[in-house]
Structures are given as C-alpha cells and as structure tokens.
Amino acid sequence: MAELTISSDEIRSAIANYTSSYSAEASREEVGVVISAADGIAQVSGLPSVMANELLEFPGGVIGVAQNLEADRVGVVVLGNYELLKEGDQVRRTGDVLSIPVGEAFLGRVINPLGQPIDGLGEIASEEDRVLELQAPTVLERQPVEEPLATGIKAIDAMTPIGRGQRQLIIGDRKTGKTAVCVDTILNQKANWETGDKTKQVRCIYVAIGQKGSTIAALRKTLEEQGALEYTTIVAAPASDAAGFKWLAPFAGAALAQHWMYQGNHVLVIYDDLTKQAEAYRAISLLLRRPPGREAYPGDVFYLHSRLLERAAKLSDELGAGSITALPIIETKANDVSAFIPTNVISITDGQVFLESDLFNRGVRPAINVGVSVSRVGGAAQTKGMKKVAGSLRLDLAAFRDLEAFATFASDLDAASKSQLERGQRLVQLLIQSENAPQAVEYQIISLWLAGEGAFDNVPVEDVRRFESELHEYLGSNAAQVYEQIAGGAQLSDESKETLLKATEDFKSAFQTTDGTPVINEPEVEALDAGQVKKDQLTVSRKVSKK
C-alpha cells in the first residue's frame, strides 16, 4: 500500500497561486428594456450612460442606433426587422459608435450600409473600422481644386468641368439621365486605372439610396461588362430596406472614401440620390417626435447634407494629397430647383449640372441645360488644351438657344443669323453622346476645335455624329501623333492644326452623307467656247441603222 505524503509547501504554493489570480472587480453592464417598437423605431428605458450614435444590441441579433437621448428613455433607430422586437425585451449597450469595416478588399463588391457583403461572394477581409460620422478636413488641411477629373462627357468637361476634390451636383427631374451621367464618369476612369499609376487612378464608390433592387443589379452588371467593377464599390440601400439604412448609406460611402483618401488615393463618390436620404431622415425624425419644419423636414436637414458633402476635399501635400470628389444627385419635381432640398444642396456644392426633361425628350442627351449649369471651379479644373478650345462654347450655345427661340416666330433671318443657327444645330449634335460611351479628352478637344474652325458646317445635321465617329477613326491612323500630344497635356500647336485641317479635308472628300450629297461641293466646270475646241480632237460616233 502506497504511503500518502502531504507537502505543506505545495499546498501553500497552490493556494497562493489561486488567490493571486483572483480579481475582486465586478463587471458592470447597462441593460435597458424595450418600451415600444413600431415603424422602425424602438423606445428603450434604462440606459442612462448611452452615447449618441451608439450601437445597441437587441435579442435575435437585431441592432439599432441611439438617437433621441431623453431623461427617462432613448429613441433608437432599428437597423433590421423591428417586427422581431417586443415590449420587455432586454437591450444591451455595445460601447461602439456606429462604424464600418474598410479596406482594399471592398473594391468590386456590393455592401450594405453596415459594411456587410450582400453580393453572395463571401466575407470581405477588412483592414480596420472607420467611424461613419467622421469630422471633415479643416481649411488648413485642404488645398485648392486644380486637377481635372474627366467625365468623358463633352458637355461637362468643356463647359462645367469637375476637379478632384470638388462637389458637383447633378440635378433634374426623374428619367432625365442623371444616373447615366455618373455611370459614364465611372466608366471613363478605366484608362487611368489600367495605368497602375496611383496619381492617376480613381477609386469609385456608388451609393444607391432607395432604388429598386433590379436597378442596382443592372448597374452592377453594366460595370462588370465594361470592366469598371474592379475599381468600384457599390453601397446599396434599396427601397425595400428600412429608413435607417437609407439614412446611413451615404455616410458609409463617405467613410470608405475617407479611408482611401487619407492613404493618398483619389476617390469618386456618387450619392444616388440625396432626395431619398432626406425623405428617409424626415420619416425617422417624425417618428422620433422631433418638431417638423419646412415641408415637414426636421430643422437639421441642412446639416445632414452639409456635414456629408464637406468631407469631399483635396488634401494638402503634407497629408498625402489624396482627394474625394462628390457627385450628389438630387431629383426635382417639374424642374423646380427652388424647392427646399434642391436649394440646400445647391448652396453646399461647388456647382451644378442641370438636366432638363424637355431637352431629354427632344433627343438631346445628356440633356444638360447650359444656361443654368455652372462650375464654381471653372477653368482651374481643365487642361490647357480644353480651356483653349472650350472658351467660347458656352456663349455660342447660349446665343444659339436665344436665336432658336426667336427663329420660331421670325419668318426671315439675315445671313449671319442663319449661319449662327446652322452652326448651333451642329454643335448640339456634336455634344450628344450615347450612354456608356465616354470620350477621351484628346478626342473631345479635337472635335470641339474642328467645330470652331467650321469643319462641320457643311455636314448635314443628321450626319454630324456619324461624321465625327468616322473622322476620329481616320485621324487615328493619319494623325495619331496629334492625339498623343494632346493626351500628354499640351495644347494644339500650329503644325498640329494644319495636320488636322488637311486630314479632315481629305476625309470629307470620301465621306458619304445619308442623302448621297457630297460634303465638299466641287466647283462647276465652265463650258468651252467654240473657238477653244480643237476639231481634230473630236471623235463623232454615229449609230448605223441595220437594214
């Protein structure tokens, strides 16, 4: 039988180790109780230390955002299915302010406003979390907007140019091509992305607010087919989502954009559209019993958009010189730009592109109203070559619109007015572009310069677009060095101008119009006098009748 030995030293050591590892601290956790839950809003009691915008956890994995902090209760915006909540459910604080994961892996993905993937392609590896409501860069952290961001749309790049770090509003009625303008801008960044040069590459974020799920799926398919999805992230809050998601979606897009901007990258963010965000915020505010103001919007709806759009900036060189360019979209009703939300956003942004339904219905697409559209950055965001050729374009088009309106009532016009009217009609055709077909800057500059030189004046109006397309194909093989010169940022030299004019004249001689008439009218050959004809050079043939 084994002898049992007891070591007092071992017992003493074991007790000492156990007591030293014991902590007398008690963890404190605040737990609230659901008083009521309806219409996406939950009223919770018993969370005295909760922070504004703090995430709260409900049973079943449902989360919410603390909004109204009152003495005896908290108004919570539920992000999820509020129908799962019932009176008496426990609510726990998370201690985290609303934030989303960010990182390079988000390119090419579709996410919800919480940063969770919804495209069925698996989890996304994030680099860090970034707070949604982050402070915008200060005045001293910014630099002036001077680098152009080409949209590929002639009417915008020439007359209302957009620079990196700018906020340019796209405004118009429904079904006027607002989304198409922004999608073309995304597609136009493909050439820069393929260079691999960080200073040229532009990452794109498309924030879809309150749109149909089928529309978002179609847009993703378009980007994928055009090869633009690899540098684009889609933040989707479709119409079927709760109002809270539509309210937060633009801030999620801005947080992801700021992550890349502070790494020295250039980002383009499209908010489609902020009207629906404002309506969602109005619904939330009314359900939270906040006092309504004009058009029932809450008093801080201006601050909602200003703090979002102020995050677009061109950072100073000390901070990496990154940028966020914002293209917010606003939908008007009956072209009324004086409504509450449109006037708010117009006052916040650095210019607007106004799309008009009348122009759209007449086939002028993009349907940009030149008289109302403006860019407050202006020529600072244009290349030297574009600034040179586009200087008088806006005035020429504005004069054409006035003359066109006058010509409908005037029966007779002088020769100068007729010439101006005909050139204006061709300019309008030249600025029309097909959807998903952005044009490189060098092509735009050559087209606009040739139009200013009268190269399109004798081309039938219905053939202008086909003439331009075939002309660029011809010039691409006969004047390729001119395209390379402009693409490098240089202006058109005198030698290049001569080359273009000569090549254009050569092309005109072979161009076939729709009605078969020549573009270049050859001078008529005068008949010779009888004395100038040498009789020995004449051969007369007669038909001999067969008997």
Curated annotation (Swiss-Prot):
- Enzyme class at the top of the EC tree: translocase
Under Gene3D superfamilies, the record lists:
2.40.30.20, ATP synthase alpha/beta chain, C-terminal domain (1.20.150.20), P-loop containing nucleotide triphosphate hydrolases (3.40.50.300)
The keyword Oxidoreductase belongs to this UniProt entry's keyword annotation: no
The subcellular localization recorded is: Cell membrane
Q: What is its main location?
A: membrane
**Catalyzes what?**
ATP + H2O + 4 H(+)(in) = ADP + phosphate + 5 H(+)(out)
Q: Any stretches that span the bilayer, and where are they?
A: none
Record-level GO cellular component terms: plasma membrane; proton-transporting ATP synthase complex
Name under which the protein is recorded: ATP synthase subunit alpha
Q: What GO molecular-function term can you cite, just one?
A: ADP binding
Q: Which family does it belong to?
A: Belongs to the ATPase alpha/beta chains family.
Note the NCBIfam families from the entry.
atpA, PRK13343.1
| Residues at the site labelled Required for activity | 373
Q: Report the superkingdom from the record.
A: Bacteria
In the bilayer, the protein is annotated as: Peripheral membrane protein
Which InterPro entries does this entry report, sorted A to Z? ATP_synth_asu-like_sf, ATP_synth_asu_C, ATP_synth_asu_C_sf, ATP_synth_F1_a_nt-bd_dom, ATP_synth_F1_asu, ATPase_a/bsu_AS, ATPase_F1/V1/A1_a/bsu_N, ATPase_F1/V1/A1_a/bsu_N_sf
Give the matching PANTHER family: ATP SYNTHASE SUBUNIT ALPHA, MITOCHONDRIAL (PTHR48082:SF2)
Gene this protein is translated from: atpA
Positions binding ATP in this chain are 172-179
Protein purpose: Produces ATP from ADP in the presence of a proton gradient across the membrane. The alpha chain is a regulatory subunit.
Summarize subunit and interaction data from the UniProt record for this chain.
F-type ATPases have 2 components, CF(1) - the catalytic core - and CF(0) - the membrane proton channel. CF(1) has five subunits: alpha(3), beta(3), gamma(1), delta(1), epsilon(1). CF(0) has three main subunits: a(1), b(2) and c(9-12). The alpha and beta chains form an alternating ring which encloses part of the gamma chain. CF(1) is attached to CF(0) by a central stalk formed by the gamma and epsilon chains, while a peripheral stalk is formed by the delta and b chains.
